[in-house]
């Protein structure tokens, strides 16, 4: 065996690499790391996947994806296993999850958890089941745990139609969710929410404690690394349902949804808060148009929000903002169809750390 030094490897023209065959050894001043693991887990991160959705009377299994660091229209990713709406979404650095939901047109409350490999394209795979079946749940995660909170279980649910339950699972191992604790405020709130590596948030939602549905502005905070109940963190700037958020490691950006009665699908308000500091959210700017239920995901720089509904139409718009600044959203591109997206999942969000 002999040693040799290589500073650069090209073909004869100098515009491409060459192949090295057989058994070879290399030395270098900065070292070399050989890729390991399955090829589906290699490559750069920063992809966001929008999980199905609906535009009544049609319901979709289709998923779209974007590369968050660029701009442009979304591309087809694959399909969920069932037509459903009002599911929650969360993600690890490799997998995106769709949690629960409502089966259309079957009219069935769903407990299943499906997952995709974010760096690839294709269909979903079965992961396990929720601890308690629900739709209108909201999802969030750090690098190890996926959680969902709130929800609507229907009149036969042992936890009541509107739920305050928090559920969790380990994202590295297939299996069912377990009970985590309770929210401070009972409500339903579907979609996806941002997080830090330790804290998850549920902002806004719809509550029926008085016998008549009302929209709320409360923010609950959950410490994801432990088990236990949420605490009250503060308020967003308006009562709303259908709010979604995304984050870097320190700041949460919240796209507000539908306003209170008379039903207003026209809240184009974006809020933000510093996740380490308890308190109320502040105004960030405006979305490019007025709509509700536009799930978001992020990388370390940008948050993107896709789809949504106004009254009476549906949107395929994707907005983005730079998380560390304030200001109005900018047009990113379009989804492949106009719809309310169930949830979103990304492999570089703030809850994953670096």
Model-based region annotation:
Residues 2-354:
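Polar, enzyme-active/binding microenvironments
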């Amino acid at each position: 065996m002999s040693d040799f030094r290589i500073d650069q490897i090209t073909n004869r023209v100098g515009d491409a690499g060459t192949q090295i065959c057989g058994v070879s050894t290399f030395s270098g001043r900065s070292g070399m790391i050989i890729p390991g693991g399955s090829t589906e887990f290699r490559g750069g991160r920063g992809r966001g996947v929008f999980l199905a959705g609906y535009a009544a009377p049609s319901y979709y299994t289709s998923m779209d994806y974007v590369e968050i660091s660029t701009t442009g229209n979304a591309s087809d990713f694959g399909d969920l296993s069932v037509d459903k709406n009002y599911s929650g979404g969360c993600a690890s650095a490799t997998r995106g999850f769709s949690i629960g939901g409502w089966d259309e047109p079957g009219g069935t409350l769903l407990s299943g958890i499906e997952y995709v490999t974010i760096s690839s394209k294709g269909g979903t795979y079965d992961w396990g089941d929720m601890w308690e079946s629900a739709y209108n749940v909201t999802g969030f995660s750090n690098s190890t745990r996926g959680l969902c909170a709130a929800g609507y279980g229907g009149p036969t649910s042992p936890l009541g139609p509107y739920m305050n339950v928090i559920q969790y699972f380990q994202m590295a191992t297939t299996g069912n969710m377990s009970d985590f604790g309770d929210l401070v405020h009972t409500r339903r709130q579907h979609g996806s929410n941002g997080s830090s590596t330790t804290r998850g948030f549920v902002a806004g939602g719809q509550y029926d404690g008085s016998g008549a549905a009302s929209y709320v502005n409360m923010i609950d905070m959950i410490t994801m690394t432990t088990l236990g109940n949420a605490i009250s963190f503060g308020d967003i700037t308006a009562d709303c349902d259908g709010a979604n958020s995304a984050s870097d490691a320190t700041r949460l950006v919240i796209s507000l949804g539908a306003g209170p009665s008379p039903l207003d699908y026209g809240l184009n308000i974006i809020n933000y808060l510093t996740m380490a500091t308890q308190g109320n959210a502040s105004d960030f700017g405006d979305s490019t148009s007025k709509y509700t239920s536009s799930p978001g995901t992020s990388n370390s720089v940008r948050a993107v929000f896709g789809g949504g509904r106004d009254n009476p139409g549906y949107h395929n718009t994707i907005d983005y903002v730079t998380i560390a600044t304030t200001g109005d959203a900018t047009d990113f591109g379009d989804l492949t169809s106009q719809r309310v997206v169930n949830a979103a999942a990304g492999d570089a969000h703030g809850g994953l750390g670096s």
